[in-house]
Amino acid sequence: MAAHRSGPLKQQNKAHKGGRHHGGGSAQRDSKGRVGPKILCKKLKRQLSRIDQRHRASQLRKQKRESVLAEKRQLGSKDGPPHQVLVVPLHSRISLPEAFKLLQNEDLGTVYLSERGSTQSFMLLCPSLKHRWFFTYARPGDLHTLLDMAKVADTILFLLDPLEGWDSTGDYCLSCLFAQGLPTYTLAVQGLSGFPPKKQIDARKKLSKMVEKRFPEDKLLLLDTQQESGMLLRQLANQKQRHLAFRDRRAYLFAHVADFVPSEESDLVGTLKISGYVRGRTLNVNSLLHIVGHGDFQMNQIDAPVDPFPLNPRVIKSQKKPNMAMEVCVTDAAPDMEEDLKVLMKADPDHQESLQTEAIPDPMEGEQTWPTEEELDEADDLLKQRSRVVKKVPKGTSSYQAEWILDEGDESDGEGGEYDDIQHEGFMEEESQDGSGEEEEEECETMTLGESVRDDLYDEKVDAEDEERMLEKYKQERLEEMFPDEMDTPRDVAARIRFQKYRGLKSFRTSPWDPKENLPRDYARIFQFQNFVNTRKRIFKEIEEKEAEGAEVGWYVTLHVSDVPVSVVEYFRQGAPLIAFSLLPYEQKMSVLNMVVSRNPGNTEPVKAKEELIFHCGFRRFRASPLFSQHTAADKHKFQRFLTADAAFVVTVFAPITFPPASVLLFKQRRNGMHSLIATGHLFSVDPDRMVIKRVVLSGHPFKIFTKMAVVRYMFFNREDVMWFKPVELRTKWGRRGHIKEPLGTHGHMKCSFDGKLKSQDTVLMNLYKRVFPKWTYDPYVPEPVPWVKSDISSTVSEVDME
């Protein structure tokens, strides 16, 4: 008889622990030779003592403090670029000439020099503070000048009114600046000294409470006397600088002087010479240069002339009047600048970046999955000759794709043709009759007009065509909110032909969809990264670690930009700013940009997808007609027909590549020329494979209801359409799911089975899906906007018409 032996799964009671008497030898026996993970590591993490931790923390604080002080010392010093200050008056009552007169403070030993060729800026030199400023201004209504100057300004000086702070134009200006990215700023109040001494304290407290909404915990400075201007200048010199990510990794320059040399072939194109101080990063002559609002260009060479605004000019010591001294210094230095002109770098054609923006597809490589124009015409002829629809399936297509891929010659790859715009006129008539009467009366009561204002004078300010167009948009937006994605099945065209590009999905979230399937021909013109995130990290790492060759930060240089139209220098001579940014690798090439934006709460005008909008993306400005889609983490994203104010959404558009982070502002041009802020956000990704899926919902009515069966009508109007869409799953608004069993008759009635009994008031729905692509509507030219003025009449009249 064999003895009993315990198996490996027998019960093992918990061993008694010896407590403090547990020795090291017993611990080794318990471990049974197992080695801890820390001993296996090659590099042990050294545990610092408490004294070493304190020492390391103090060293880190010292390094941060030294870096901040070094940045302060460089900006505005003799070795760095001048401290560029943008003065923005936020109220119409503010006197800008008076503010400039106070800022030209001679009590601190400053020297004033008028900028040659421009009346909008001046240089301010202060040897006692070892600082130099370059002051310029922008009116809040001048949108392009304001945003362009804010891109390169080191500090923005906001001038506030002592009573109201800012008006409607100033508030609109702040909304745009906050969305673009605000650099270092300072708040100054002008005109407070005109109040009685007892009321000055109350006015300042009231203004501080008002300013807290936009600028929490910020101190208000005064600008009424020379002493207050001196305090303001010291604040500007010692203020900690805020960083804007999109400009810290690029070299940029504000043009102080611009000259144009026409080419031998034509007087309309030539070499543009722009002079200014290099900021941001080292400027390489082989990189491309983007002139804001004008496009991308190549540089021929970089010159290094003498700095025309030195902090300590030699002639100043031998003169009595500071203004005269600087004038003598500049006039004497002018011929020397030509003699001492040094060529810093010349472009190397082998290493210079190309201006190629689009890819050139090779038709022999078979890159295109979209048929040619000849194939589309042949498909149209075949459809006209044959009575039945024949499916053309590409080679290698799965059975799942073959179920829904048809001839695509009848429908444009846009949003859905004229049938997408079919509206429920009867519903809108009922909607206009039903509204809440009390609210309408209140709105009408608030629209009180003076008796002296005649109706004909009021009508002169109202555009009847614009009102009709806006009313139609409001109707479409309200229908989309009430019945999202629902569409009436057309009766003059068979549904299987009308929706031949659409397919059914078992689940919008989990069903597969190939992102490379049936791409449009425009996708052959763009560039795509194998891994955009890794490429971005690599480029940014090279910027931080590599020592670039070229013009260092703070140098006064002259850039020779080739093949520039003469309109650029004419734009500068009219008083507009000229700003240039260097481009990172690949940033001149076209791709698909996805931007996450949110609706501006100050704008309630309905905006439909594929309407032309104006984009301010980082340092670029362009026009395009984008797609709107939901911002989700899935692989498929639902197309949005209108902008929504309740959540963030993604805007997809063809545009040049830009590496995030970069701010995004969306404007819409009104018929009077003004640009209205629609949405704000940031650049999300550069990804052509991001799928935007448009959904169409066909609805039907349960005609006869049985236990789990029902006869549905009005979804289709012929037997062939019922058979065609039979594989697609049905759903109801009350949560039931079902399938089409068989058609009944020849008028589109069909027998359907569901997972439960239907209610008589329920609606049967069918979801169809199609991938949509953005249109190639990129236009780098953006017209200058009319100065922004708040208009209450148009919004009020639209509300009255809607009633």
From Swiss-Prot:
Bias type Basic and acidic residues, positions: 65-76
InterPro entries, per the entry: AARP2CN, Bms1/Tsr1, BMS1_TSR1_C, G_Bms1/Tsr1_dom
Disordered as annotated region, ranges: 1-83, 428-447
Biased composition (Basic residues): 13-23
Localization annotation: Nucleus, Nucleolus
Principal subcellular localization: nucleus
Domain of life where this protein originates: Eukaryota
Disulfide bonds: none
Oxidoreductase found in the keyword field: no
Keywords from the named record: Nucleus, Ribosome biogenesis
Start and end residues of each Bms1-type G domain: 81-242
Keyword Nucleus belongs to the record: yes
One GO cellular component, as annotated: nucleolus
GO biological process: ribosome biogenesis
UniProt biased composition (Acidic residues): 428-445
Record family assignment: Belongs to the TRAFAC class translation factor GTPase superfamily. Bms1-like GTPase family. TSR1 subfamily.
Role noted for this protein: Required during maturation of the 40S ribosomal subunit in the nucleolus.
Listed name of the protein: Pre-rRNA-processing protein TSR1 homolog
